[in-house]
């Protein structure tokens, strides 16, 4: 099996057969902001064959500090437009299905249908719970990630799990990032960890974070895995 030159630095971390299998996988990314941009870029560089993603926002100046698809020239343009452009420049061989659409209860199941895994890059607890419910109904595994300030968290959710309810309980609305901000390093770090977990699942390896949550504190550089 001949691995393309562009993927050879993946080999050793994963096998040639695992690299080949990634070409057949389809990943749904919910959101193209701070987390979602990094997630999609890493999936494209890793060689995942099919990336489906949604977002309904345009780039604003406040995105420039942390969102990898945002540039001064992209301000006012749709995040989906810039995502397509950058991902095709990175890897023209992959299939992209990127839509300017909002995730809601009414469309959630249709959006994720046919995907092998879902990666959460949302900033709304309500929308995360909608996504998790749809994933459960469609029997699709999901990687959860969230960020705020110096802090982040990552967890892996199988269809039979009730992880987000355990994490958030009855909380609603936006996450804490609206009040304490987001520097560039937390989305990059949490996105990397989400993609690592997603890739493990896609190639048939065991997840490290099912029924657990990785709590990240970059201020104190403290990383703790907690059972949930």
Can you name each region flagged by the protein language model?
Residues 29-31, 54:
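Conserved N-terminal Rossmann-fold NAD(P)-binding element of oxidoreductases
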Residues 48, 53-91:
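Glycine-rich phosphate-binding loop and adjoining beta1-alpha1-beta2 segment
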Residues 35-36:
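Hydrophobic/small residue at the entry helix of a nucleotide-binding pocket
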Residues 78-117, 122-128:
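A structured beta-alpha segment of the ubiquitous adenosine-cofactor-binding alpha/beta core
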Residues 1-28, 167:
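N-terminal charged helix/coil linker that caps or initiates catalytic domains
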Residues 2, 109-117, 121-228:
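Glycine-rich phosphate/adenylate-binding loop
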Residues 43:
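Aromatic pocket-lining residues of Rossmann-like dinucleotide-binding sites
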């Amino acid at each position: 099996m001949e691995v393309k030159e562009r993927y050879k630095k993946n080999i050793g971390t994963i096998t040639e057969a695992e690299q080949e299998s990634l070409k057949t996988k389809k990943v749904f990314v919910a959101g193209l902001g701070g987390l979602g941009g990094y997630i999609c870029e890493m999936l494209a560089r890793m060689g995942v064959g099919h990336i489906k993603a949604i977002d309904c926002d345009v780039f604003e100046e406040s995105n420039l500090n942390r969102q990898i698809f945002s540039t001064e020239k992209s301000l006012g343009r749709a995040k989906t437009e810039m995502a397509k452009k950058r991902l095709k420049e990175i890897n023209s061989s992959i299939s992209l299905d990127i839509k300017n659409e909002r995730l809601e209860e009414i469309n959630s199941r249709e959006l994720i249908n046919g995907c092998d895994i879902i990666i959460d890059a949302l900033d709304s607890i309500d929308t995360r719970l909608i996504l998790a419910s749809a994933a459960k109904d469609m029997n699709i595994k999901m990687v959860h990630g969230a960020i705020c300030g110096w802090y982040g968290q990552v967890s892996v959710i199988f269809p039979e799990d009730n992880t987000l309810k355990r994490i958030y309980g009855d909380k609603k609305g936006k996450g804490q990032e609206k009040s304490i901000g987001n520097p560039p390093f937390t989305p990059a770090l949490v996105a990397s960890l989400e993609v690592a977990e997603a890739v493990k699942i896609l190639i048939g390896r065991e997840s490290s974070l099912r029924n657990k949550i990785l709590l990240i504190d970059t201020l104190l550089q403290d990383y703790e895995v907690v059972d949930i």
